[in-house]
Amino acid sequence: MKKYSTNLTDSQWNIINNLLQDKRSRKYKIRDIFDAIFYLLKTGCQWRMLPHCFPPWETVYYYFTVWKHKGIIELIHEHLRDKIRMKAGKDKSPSLGLIDSQSVKTTRSGGICRGIDGGKKTKGRKRHIIVDSLGLLLAVVVHAANEHDSKSATKVIKLLKDRFSRLIKIIADGGYRGEFIENTKTAFGIILEVILRKDDSPKFHVIPKRWVVERTFAWFESYRSLPKP
């Protein structure tokens, strides 16, 4: 098979293969299927436009769908996140999270409904994420762009319940205020710390800690399948 920069290295494949524990003989190699998925993720091509050096697109799509519904992809993601955190000298379970949302224009009509974000004048969808102090994803929710942040933020915070026992604080921007702060503490036992911008400053300033979650959104831009959910 042709080599692409998105192909898994041997060490990367060994990590995934050990998690799958799938020793069955198949017509197409599972590694080649993963390589096809990563190629699509990076280039943003359509399933039907996958290069012929990969397994048939129908096969790749089938496995991707099965792994998604069975939680295999999430399992791999969580395992890799844990490895990175431990390598950085951190506990598997974070004590701090950072939350933010991003409205994205999209013309895709299938799947999640679209809406208009009145504040940003964006028609499409919004993704709400919570990351750890390294910028690694802890939870994500995608919804119509017109859904209020406090409503969708509750959904994404709810995904953390019972998963991260050490999580006690989430840092947010000025869009998360009022009753939402108290409701988050009451419902989930999590403190929401709001860090505001210095509006009186004419120059650009990096907001302490907040840049971490903003950098994660920037990472998404490197993969053409991710900017438009």
Per-range role (PLM):
Residues 1-229:
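Short alpha-helical elements
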